[in-house]
Design a protein with these regions (language model features):
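N-terminal Rossmann-like NAD(P)+-binding domain of SDR-like oxidoreductases, especially those catalyzing
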Residues: 1-182, 232, 251, 285, ...
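C-terminal substrate-binding subdomain of Rossmann-fold SDR/epimerase-dehydratase oxidoreductases
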Residues: 4, 20, 38, 57, ...
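Residue-level recognition of oxygen-bearing side chains
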Residues: 64, 95, 102, 131, ...
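Proline-centered turn/helix-capping motifs that create local helix->coil transitions or kinks
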Residues: 116, 124, 136-137, 171, ...
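A glycine/serine/threonine-rich, flexible loop-to-helix segment
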Residues: 138, 189-197
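Active-site helix-initiating loop/hinge in glycosyltransferases
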Residues: 184, 188, 217-220
């Protein structure tokens, strides 16, 4: 049975990817440093699976990563370990530089060293559409120039360039993916959709930045993870692949749709109302990806319709409210990203 390493596997995307990899009969080694966003709740359903194991390790620990590679001899690494919340990057960029740039550098060094004795291993580096920056119209394709605006986006852009440079300079077997906004079960409640659901369930107002017109492309985490597996199996080494759904909605549309869904499941308290709040500094207005490359070359398409996926997502958080209890309440309700005031 082949082994796969997933970095950041206690997080949202990582834990969902591990679930799919186990279903596809891989042995999975989850490497996570256990940050504020890490949650053992996310892996509780398969932590006793004989094909799953966990190692506490920061990807900055180059020697330890190399030892893990030598000991386990995996066929692939999915690098999902990252700081990802834009608002937090505004308040404290240093953590993003440390994890998303220095961490990727040290992971690449360990990978390069190990590749000398194993020239079959592949690295899939997971990135974001935010590296392309604000897009007034059209959709960003893989050859678009990077134009990051937040410290988070800049750190991810730097990591993408690092991976690309190691591919070209050291002939490393790696692929980079850039994905649009994810939603689904087990997402940290600092993010828009789980935070809105939390506020609905707790009878709280629904804070929306600015005028609520900022638009994002939304993809279910299951579709994203299936795309990652497809890239691992069939993707061309050295290439970049965009992963998106072509489904754009603004924040007000998301909120109104969630309220519509909630009314079918629970009784809505009168306190649950949309509340427009001060916008995030440098808030990009629109992101949108052109995903034709992965669709045409790898025969991948997103399958989950947004309205159905959002309904199932609300239902999951409603039925698993103990998930919220596994986080510090202050992390859920606290407003971040206003440090420039």
């Amino acid at each position: 049975m082949q082994k796969i390493i997933v970095t950041g596997g206690l997080g949202f995307i990582g834990s969902n990817l591990i679930k799919i990899l186990l279903q596809k009969k891989y042995k999975v080694i989850n490497i996570d440093k256990i940050s504020y966003a890490s949650n053992f709740y996310n892996v509780k359903n398969f932590k006793k699976n004989k094909n799953y194991s966990f190692i506490k390790c920061d990807i900055n620990y180059k020697k330890k990563i190399l030892n893990i590679l030598k000991r386990n001899k995996p066929v692939g690494i999915f690098n999902i370990a990252a700081e990802t919340h834009v608002d937090r990057s505004i308040d404290g960029p240093k953590a993003f530089i440390n994890s998303n740039i220095l961490g990727v550098f040290n992971l690449l060094e360990a990978f390069k060293n190990y590749s000398k004795s194993n020239n079959k291993i592949k690295l899939i580096h997971i990135s974001t559409d935010e590296v392309f920056g604000d897009l007034k119209k059209g959709r960003s394709h893989e050859n678009f120039a990077y134009n990051p605006t937040s410290p988070y986006a800049a750190s991810k852009a730097a990591s993408d360039h690092l991976v690309s440079s190691y591919i070209k300079t050291y002939d490393l077997r790696a692929i980079v993916t850039n994905c649009s906004n994810n939603y689904g079960p087990r997402q940290h409640p600092e993010k828009l959709i789980p935070k809105l659901i939390y506020n609905i369930l707790k009878n709280r107002p629904l804070p929306i930045y600015g005028k609520g017109k900022n638009s994002r492309e939304w993809i279910h985490v299951y579709d994203h993870c299936e795309a990652l597996v497809k890239v691992f199996k069939k993707g061309k080494l050295g290439e970049f692949y965009n992963i998106g759904s072509n489904k754009n909605l603004n924040n007000l549309e998301i909120t109104k749709l969630l309220l519509k869904i909630a009314k079918k499941i629970i009784k809505i308290n009168s306190n649950v109302k949309i509340k427009l709040v001060k916008d995030r500094p440098g808030h990009d207005f629109r992101y949108a990806l052109n995903s034709n490359k992965i669709k045409k070359r790898l025969n991948w398409n997103s399958k989950i319709k947004f309205e159905k996926g959002l309904y199932e997502t609300f239902l999951w958080y409603y039925k698993n409210q103990s998930f919220y209890d596994s986080f510090d309440k202050k992390d859920i309700i606290r407003r971040l990203g206003l440090k420039n005031d």
